[in-house]
Amino acid sequence: MAIGRADGQCGPRTIAGITTFQAGFLRHPDGLVEPGGKTLQRLSLVGFKPATTNKVTPKVTSPQAIKQAVPSEITGSITRLVPRSSLGTLNPGLKAVSNTYMIEKLGKPRESFSSDCQPITSARLKKYIQTTSVGPFKVEGLKPAVDSLQAIMSEILIKHPDIYSALGSAGMLCCRYVRGSTTSISNHSWGSAIDLKLNGVLDQRGDPGVTVQYGLSVIAPIFNNHGWYWGAAFRTEDAMHFEVSRSLLEKWLPDLK
């Protein structure tokens, strides 16, 4: 890729050069050269020495100019697909909940299920169901899960505003079986899971190439840090799906009597 001559400022050409350089060693090039960061360390290896710039007044570059400067073949769309195998370890330290565990701890949300969404009938659980906005969309789900989602979305807004603005919900509370099953109850039935879409596009569940949307892979670590398990790790990959992990649910159980 032809970057062009240096323009003497951290403008579009410089940012394009940085992201092109980063593409050789970073999974997600960001155009940043931070003190002690990996990019500066790599530059040092090739003999780069920072210039003295204390007499230079920095020029402010607009977010739009930065976006246009980053090569499309490096960043691409947030809905572009990346191999699950390229993402490393998923859900470190977290464990998904089973039907047996959920029924033991919270009881059945209702007595009968089908492949279609049906209302929750459990008197115990109904009092903990909440409908509210979590930022980019409104959800209905288990109250502590909804509260947790609000915190997650607030963090995504700060760290990845472009992804935040593209996020939509494909449903949270939905009493039904897992897709393709007539025995396994979906964790959506307890209001403790959510399916996400980006720019209105759903990640295809169990696609032959076992790929996931890039944007979902970026925000998955934030969900993990808040105790949510990413469905991309399921035997049948389900990257649109995020659910409350066992350890997080255990923290809530005393308040869900």
Where are these regions (language model features)?
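Active-site acidic/histidine clusters and adjacent loop/turn architecture
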Residues: 101-166
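Catalytic cores and adjacent binding grooves of peptidoglycan-active enzymes
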Residues: 181-257
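Active-site-adjacent loop/helix surface patches within enzyme catalytic domains
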Residues: 150-192, 203
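Cell-envelope/ECM-targeting effectors and their regulatory/trafficking segments
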Residues: 1-117, 254-256
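A generic secondary-structure signal for well-formed alpha-helical elements
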Residues: 25, 47, 153-160, 227, ...
